[in-house]
Amino acid sequence: MMRKPEVQIGNSSLCQIWKESEMNAPLLPTASHQARQVSLSGFNLINSPRLNKGTAFTDHERDVFDLHGLLPPHVGSLDDQIVRRIQALRDQPSPFNKYSLLRDLQDTNETLFYALLLRNIEEMLPLVYTPTVGEGCQRFSEIWRKPRGLFLSYPNKDRIDRILSHHRYDDVKCIVVSDGERILGLGDQGAGGMGIPIGKMALYTALGGIHPEHCLPILLDVGTNNEDRLKSPLYIGWRHNRVRGEEYDAFVEVFVNSVKKRWPHVLLQWEDFARSNAARLLDRYKSQLCTFNDDIQGTAAVATAALLSALNVADSGARRA
């Protein structure tokens, strides 16, 4: 079987989205504005969330990539697609239904997902992340459809190096990792906690201008003590009570060492770990790689920034008076 030669896919896809994203983060020009060389075609191309453009593929692209017949004949623009999707989104009966639709869109067409997010940022943020992501984590197993990110389970601890070695992760620069034990105010959600790293990485892209290929959500699945999850026939995680103590620490150590070896300069963000683990893991690894805990340092940094801004406003008002 002949390999499809690499051909450029037009820059009407993610490229223009990154231009909009970088307006939010002008100091982080991490995304390419160039057309991309791809060797996929047909079903493989339209099943790639990062490359799929849906009806926005031009006639020429449909010829080159064997897409005729796989797509309806209408050739639309990204703007047309946004209008269609925002209408479908607003027709949903609840925030969770909207969240589910957006997750499905992210897993099928990242270009359209981020375009929708960026152009309707105030409306979309509460759906992509808090508060709706909480229910998304609780019902994660119900709506799971396609792989996104990595589930590193305790039984696979000896395979972590191999899992991380896949070439699709060559360009990773940022990782958000959780063990699902303290998800927002909802407690232990086990593997459902993956909704948090996925949502946070979407914010890295939408608000920070960081290309999705540089972002990797990871869930450390060390079991769960949530009986509802363990008893549910739909639960997708490791059905086991949480690993604790030395076994837990050894597993995290294997994970961090694998990350350091694979990506020596990566940013590792710890997210929604239990109080008993959050600070001590940060203390243990903060000198080994670029890392921070969002619940400890991120919240504190934002609170400090808000106070400094308020002081500046108050001082400015006092001078004007």
At which residue positions do the language-model features occur?
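Methionine residue identity
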Residues: 1-2
